[in-house]
């Protein structure tokens, strides 16, 4: 009963905060407010410069490899399982996929900054 009460309270509080943020938007946007601020001087360069596609691809690759490493973190606790061969095979499969994807990125020159 306490769990349901806590869950309902948190849900209602989250919904209330979401409704308040939609009802009270910042509508007074003007040119001076949307310009970048550099210590009171006029900006030296535009603030909305697009970043390179190479950086974006490296960032996405990092996120994917980080996710795969996070999947490997519970392996020490998984060694205590009753079905050890299945756990070893699945971990070897995951490590193989990680190594093959790294080799593919390397061969496609996805990790090289110089062109």
From Swiss-Prot:
GO terms for cellular component: mitochondrial inner membrane; respiratory chain complex I. This is NADH-ubiquinone oxidoreductase chain 3. It is an enzyme of class 7 (translocase). Its main location: mitochondrion. It holds the Pfam family Oxidored_q4. It comes from Pan paniscus. InterPro entries: NADH_UbQ/plastoQ_OxRdtase_su3 (IPR000440), NDAH_ubi_oxred_su3_sf (IPR038430). It is a multi-pass membrane protein. Core subunit of the mitochondrial membrane respiratory chain NADH dehydrogenase (Complex I) which catalyzes electron transfer from NADH through the respiratory chain, using ubiquinone as an electron acceptor. Essential for the catalytic activity of complex I. The keyword Transmembrane applies.
């Amino acid at each position: 009963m306490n769990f349901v009460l806590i869950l309902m309270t948190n849900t209602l509080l989250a919904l209330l905060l979401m409704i308040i943020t939609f009802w009270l938007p910042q509508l007074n946007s003007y040119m001076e407010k949307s310009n970048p601020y550099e210590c009171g001087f006029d900006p030296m360069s535009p603030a909305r410069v697009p970043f390179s596609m190479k950086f974006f691809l490296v960032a996405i690759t990092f996120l994917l490899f980080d996710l795969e490493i996070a999947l490997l973190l519970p392996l020490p606790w998984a060694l205590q399982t009753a079905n050890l061969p299945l756990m070893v095979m699945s971990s070897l499969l995951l490590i193989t996929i990680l190594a093959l994807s790294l080799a593919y990125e390397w061969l496609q020159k996805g990790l090289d900054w110089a062109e």
